[in-house]
UniProtKB/Swiss-Prot annotation:
Signal peptide: none annotated. It comes from Acinetobacter baylyi (strain ATCC 33305 / BD413 / ADP1). It comes from the Bacteria. Keywords: Cell membrane, Glycosyltransferase, Membrane, Transferase, Transmembrane, Transmembrane helix. Disruption phenotype: Loss of glycosylation of the ComP protein. The chain crosses the membrane at residues 8-28, 32-52, 68-88, 91-111, 119-139, 164-184, 189-209, 213-233, 239-259, 331-351, 363-383, 418-438. Its EC number is 2.4.-.-. The gene is pglL2. This is ComP-specific O-oligosaccharyltransferase.
């Protein structure tokens, strides 16, 4: 009987890891968010692993620094209460991502304390399989042999993306997998020949992304490795790795441009010298930080910060939902002072983690985290659960090295964990129900709009996805019907969170008609003109007596 239960447990763990890995290769299909289904599948994998392991562990331990999570959650609650966070949906997402990060950390932390490396090895193997499949998809993007709904068949300006649809995300996945491969080799889980072949494939795939964040990661990781291990043989290994990597960085784009006449790859020199819009937006967003230095603009509302502070000299033709820098986002969301404190805590945690590492296997796992955080300084992989979960798990797994005595952690009763996991499962199911409701509402509105300018109001109770629901209403419904159903503040919130011509003009019209909040309405008209790179034109006011 015990053997049957053990098999069931092992199969369930495999299924959880499988869901986590499959999030990287399923296509982007949701109308609400291009990565929604991928992220939900990753969360499903985490919940399965936690549920199985909660019965397996004799005791569940939580580090004392968990209180910092509670501090951040408290800040988000305050922002919701005072109205800085516009929709419950944004509050829910922010809390959920922190809870997901904490649960991932908790799983890794207790997995290591219980002397088990089963999950980390299974994650390593599933990532290796996923990246090899993604490598084939990336090759197909270059040669375009197979066209299929399930394949992201076009590259990103000649840069490989696989089914992630974004080259830097694909690059970070490859780097994480490369160091998980090194971890397996260090644990003697594969031989030298297999290791060398897979390593070369991973490096080649990474070079195809032409990711500059990967270049920075390789330089930083090489230095961190040599700081830990300073023997001559280690120096030779680092030099050899860098020779292979940088040679491929230079040669692979030339090779593809030679083979394919359309020259669909940037040269390495082009990638090295070309600019980036993120460097143009950062100065403007830094000004926005000091515009609200104490409480910020609310978690997840970087776009609001940009719209509120934009002017004629700001970056044109760009609207950012994230600043492309984790620390800048934290300052925008929380204000300069609290954001700076959280940023320093993150850096201190990483430095302490690195200092506590005593062996190569842990160092390779730490390099997975480093690759992720370097990417966080140039983009926003922290906004995707399929990255957050494995990185949180690895942080928890490595951080057990910091435990010096029993004061460093406290026990969590299985009853409390079971209750909490039960709430997480209920929240997960409730979220899926609302996703289906919103998808239905979007389909109904879109179908009606095909045949008539007048769309009938579709009323559904949305307790979680209130922002998406209101966005659909303001996008499709007549101005007069919106006036009857919503307040001026609702017009403002939707316009600043989901700016498009229809929604912005409706907000401007009601503000002018009521002769209230006109400064904010004029600001978003100016801001919208800048992000669309158009001349500032005051829109025609909408009136109930006129159909449009």
């Amino acid at each position: 009987m015990n053997s049957i239960f053990k098999k069931i447990k092992n199969y369930t763990i495999v299924s959880g890891v499988f869901f986590l890995g499959s999030a990287f290769i399923i296509p982007n299909t949701s109308n609400l968010s291009s990565t929604l289904y991928k992220e939900l599948i990753a969360v499903l994998g985490l919940l399965i692993l936690l549920t199985v392991k909660s019965f397996d562990y004799k005791k569940i331990l939580i580090p004392k620094n968990f209180y910092w999570f509670l501090f951040v959650i408290f800040i988000i609650f305050i922002q919701l209460i005072v109205g800085e966070i516009y929709f419950f949906q944004d509050f829910f997402f922010s809390i959920s991502f922190l809870v997901i990060l904490f649960l991932s950390f908790l799983l890794g932390f207790n997995e290591r304390l219980n002397g088990d490396d089963l999950i980390v090895k299974k994650i390593a193997w599933i990532f290796i399989i996923v990246v090899q499949i993604s490598f084939l998809i990336a090759i197909n993007q270059k040669i375009e042999i197979v066209q299929n709904f399930f394949l992201f068949s076009s590259s990103y300006n000649g840069r490989s993306t696989a089914n992630l649809g974004q080259p830097n995300q694909f690059s970070t996945l490859i780097l994480i997998t490369l160091f998980l491969l090194c971890y397996l080799r260090e644990k003697n889980s594969l031989n030298n020949m297999v290791f060398n072949i897979l390593s070369f494939c991973l490096i080649f795939a990474n070079v195809m992304t032409q990711s500059r964040s990967a270049w920075i990661s390789v330089i930083l990781i090489s230095l961190l490795y040599l700081l830990k291990f300073q023997k001559k043989i280690e120096l030779r290994r680092v030099i050899f790795f860098n020779i292979v990597f940088w040679t491929l960085v230079y040669c692979v784009p030339l090779l593809f441009n030679l083979i394919f006449f359309q020259k669909n790859s940037y040269s390495t020199f082009d990638r090295l010298t070309m600019g980036s819009s993120r460097f143009e937006i950062w100065p403007q967003l830094l000004k926005a930080v000091f515009h609200k230095p104490f409480i910020g603009y609310g978690w997840g509302q970087t776009g609001v910060a940009q719209l509120e502070t934009i002017n004629k000299s700001s970056t044109k033709g760009e609207w950012f939902t994230y600043s492309h820098n984790l620390f800048l986002d934290l300052m925008l969301w929380n204000g300069f002072f609290i954001g700076l404190i959280i940023s320093i805590l993150i850096l201190c945690f990483l430095i302490e983690l690195y200092s506590s590492i005593k062996n190569k296997s842990d160092l390779f796992l730490f390099f997975c985290v480093v690759a992720f955080f370097v990417h966080c300084l140039l983009e926003y992989p922290f906004a995707y659960t399929y990255f957050l979960i494995p990185v949180g798990f690895l942080c928890g797994y490595i951080s057990t090295q910091n435990i010096k005595n029993s004061i460093s952690y406290f026990n969590l009763s299985k009853r409390k964990l079971t209750l909490f996991l039960g709430c997480c499962w209920l929240g997960y199911v409730a979220f899926w129900v609302e996703v289906l409701d919103i998808s239905k509402k979007n389909e109904i509105y879109a179908r009606q709009f095909l045949f008539s300018n007048h769309v009938k109001f579709y009323n559904i109770e949305n307790y979680i996805l209130d922002g998406f629901s209101k966005q659909l209403d303001f996008q499709y419904l007549d101005y007069c019907e919106l006036k009857d159903k919503y307040q001026l503040l609702d017009f403002k919130k939707v316009a600043y969170r989901y700016p498009n011509a229809s929604i912005v003009y409706k907000y401007y019209s009601i503000s002018a008609e009521m002769k209230m909040d006109q400064k904010s309405a004029n600001q978003i008209i100016r801001a919208y003109s800048v992000i669309k790179n158009q001349k500032i034109i005051k829109p025609k006011l909408k009136f109930c007596s006129i159909e449009y």
